[in-house]
């Protein structure tokens, strides 16, 4: 199942689904908006995840030019989608915009990064 992410336009809640039953996701009394990766007008070189697979270890860095990690502008999380599911890592201001995923026998399909100002970014693998 392809990963999909949704946001509440009122409170900012972000969710993903484990099973999509086909009914709209609702928050604050309104339908949540699906986030479409790579559609915000911003620098791709600072937002697109860069992934390097070495054996079962996937290293992901956000941006060919490293993304800032300031209190007001940073990457909140990185998600790796695999053939059988996925893993997420949460980041904080001041940390490097990178993480390592141990995938075991899982095959990575795509990596996503979420910028608090410029939204969702994705690189297919």
Q: What is each residue range found by the language model?
A:
Residues 5, 24, 112:
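Residues immediately within or flanking Cys/His clusters that coordinate Zn2+
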Residues 8-11, 27, 115:
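Short cysteine-rich clusters marking metal-coordination/redox-active sites
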Residues 17-21, 35-38, 123-125:
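Short Cys/His-rich "knuckle" micro-motifs
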Residues 21-31:
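Cysteine-rich micro-motifs
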Residues 62-70:
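Short amphipathic, basic-aromatic surface patches that mediate peripheral association
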Residues 97-101:
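Short strand-edge motifs at loop-to-beta-strand transitions and within beta-strands
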Residues 107-117:
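Short, aromatic- and glycine-rich surface loops/edge beta-strands on solvent-exposed regions
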Residues 116-124:
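Short acidic/polar inter-strand loop motif in beta-rich domains
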């Amino acid at each position: 199942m392809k990963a999909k992410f949704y946001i509440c336009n009122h409170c900012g809640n972000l969710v993903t689904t484990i099973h999509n039953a086909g009914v709209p996701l609702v928050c604050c009394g309104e339908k949540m908006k699906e986030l479409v990766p790579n559609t915000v007008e911003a620098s791709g070189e600072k937002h697109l995840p860069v992934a390097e697979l070495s054996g079962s270890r996937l290293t992901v860095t956000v941006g060919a030019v490293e993304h800032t990690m300031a209190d007001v502008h940073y990457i909140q999380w990185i998600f790796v989608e695999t053939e059988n599911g996925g893993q997420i890592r949460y980041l904080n201001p001041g940390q490097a915009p990178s993480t390592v995923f141990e995938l075991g026998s899982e095959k990575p399909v795509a990596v996503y990064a979420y910028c608090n100002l410029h939204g969702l970014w994705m690189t297919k693998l």
